[in-house]
């Protein structure tokens, strides 16, 4: 569980990053969840954009993805989702070393 200072630090790190995933009309699919999980293992911090044509609510999508990937929702701002998960390999823990 992240505290407010950790969330603030992760938000500041993610603000400079572009969204690397998009959720469209199809919603949150199995392939998307697998790709997001792999990215979380490699990067620890992932920014996702929910497109305007998507019927999926960003908050609900964030909770669903977080549950399926065992990650934590850092924040949902508008249609952007930021997720964090500590990498299982210690050499991949660049972001978690900051918090």
Question: How should these model regions be labeled?
Answer:
Residues 1-99:
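Positively charged, polar, low-complexity stretches
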């Amino acid at each position: 569980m992240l505290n407010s200072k950790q969330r603030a630090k992760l938000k500041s790190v993610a603000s400079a990053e572009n969204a690397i995933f998009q959720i469209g009309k199809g919603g949150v699919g199995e392939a998307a969840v697998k790709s997001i999980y792999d990215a979380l293992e490699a990067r620890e911090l992932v920014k996702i954009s929910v497109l305007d044509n998507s019927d999926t609510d960003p908050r609900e999508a964030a909770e669903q993805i977080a549950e399926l990937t065992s990650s934590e929702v850092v924040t949902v701002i508008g249609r952007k989702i930021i997720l964090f998960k500590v990498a299982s390999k210690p050499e991949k823990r660049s972001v978690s070393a900051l918090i």
